[in-house]
Amino acid sequence: MISTPYYLIDKSALLRNLQVIDQVRERSGAKVLLALKCFATWSVFDLMQQYMDGTTSSSLYEVKLGHQKFGGETHAYSVAFADHEIDEVVAHCDKIIFNSISQFQRFSSHAGNKPKGLRLNPGVSCASFDLADPARPFSRLGESDPARILSIIDQLDGVMIHNNCENRDFERFDALLTEVEQRYGEILHRLSWVSLGGGISFTTPGYSIDAFCERLRRFAQTYDVQVYLEPGEATVRDTTTLEVSVVDIGFNGKNLAVVDSSTEAHMLDLLIYRETAPIKNAQGDHAYQICGKTCLAGDIFGEARFEQPLQIGDRISIGDAGGYTMVKKNWFNGVHMPAIAIKEADGSVRAVREFSFDDYVSSLS
């Protein structure tokens, strides 16, 4: 048995999402790229490659990882490329997308004949949290002025639009896309490809897949463009758990269970977005606050109920631990970093990466 803590990726659950993605590809004509900023655990890329067209990135290292480990199309994007990295980025990508016109003007000559794009910020989004809203005031994410974009349109092959965030509502997606068309239609007609980014929760049960595919197909036909999608969370939703063990039990107005993991170090977005972790099979008469083991007072996974009183050594599965977890894990407090394990279709589990004190030491100097 693998020692806790560890991330457990269920390949059967991952396959369910990938089959939805493949259905969207086939029915809409869109190409689908994995957003490495969300999930970059390359030990399952052999499965994902069969259902996706490539990767999209936010940095030089992600570009290289996508090119070397995933294959297919490799799209390079960054909020700001640096002089010392641009040539290496170009060497590992198939398309390069610039965040601003100034970046485009500075570096487009380095890209040679490779397709070039620009991030288009339509100024509207569905983000409910200001921290993640690309349309927030004074946003640095992309260009909004149609006239400025048209000034370089003859040098552009495509644009990337990323203004959805955990959007589970097709009608909201449709409305946002319509706003983009109304303001930027002249630009769209002069491109060969358009990426609609990520944040579209089309693998969520009950999502209007039929309407979604038809909308993508119609958009592609209207503007004669290849549509790209860049799912991250939608790819790995409900595929991964963080397996932890209870290491202490206490009471301070409520029952407290301290586990051998941490939100700050292992599921950081719970803190950033003030969310509560879903606890698997958490129902019963015995309520506990599930606490992380760092010194941070607010290192709390959430509340859960259990059929029996918890004991030291009991294992707990914390759900939805695939997106923005392994790519953000850190060594805060020197807490043991979770291993990464894979559950195969036959139910067998194998560890693919384990971390040690040597990894902690080598991450510092």
Swiss-Prot record:
Catalytic activity: carboxynorspermidine + H(+) = norspermidine + CO2; carboxyspermidine + H(+) = spermidine + CO2
Localization terms from the record: Cytoplasm
Protein name as it appears in the record: Carboxynorspermidine/carboxyspermidine decarboxylase
Family under the similarity heading: Belongs to the Orn/Lys/Arg decarboxylase class-II family. NspC subfamily.
GO cellular component: cytoplasm
Encoding gene per record: nspC
Modified positions (N6-(pyridoxal phosphate)lysine) in chain numbering: 37
Cofactor(s) listed: pyridoxal 5'-phosphate
A Pfam family the protein falls into: Orn_DAP_Arg_deC
Enzyme class of the recorded protein, top EC level: lyase
UniProtKB keywords: Cytoplasm, Decarboxylase, Lyase, Polyamine biosynthesis, Pyridoxal phosphate, Spermidine biosynthesis
Summary of subunit composition and partner proteins: Homodimer.
Principal subcellular localization: cytoplasm
Any Gene Ontology biological process: nor-spermidine biosynthetic process
Induction of expression: By arsenic.
Ligand binding (substrate): 233, 269
InterPro entries (alphabetical): Ala_racemase/Decarboxylase_C, De-COase2_C, Nsp_de-COase, PLP-binding_barrel
Source taxonomy: Bacteria, Pseudomonadati, Pseudomonadota, Betaproteobacteria, Burkholderiales
Annotated GO MF terms: carboxy-lyase activity; diaminopimelate decarboxylase activity; protein homodimerization activity; pyridoxal phosphate binding
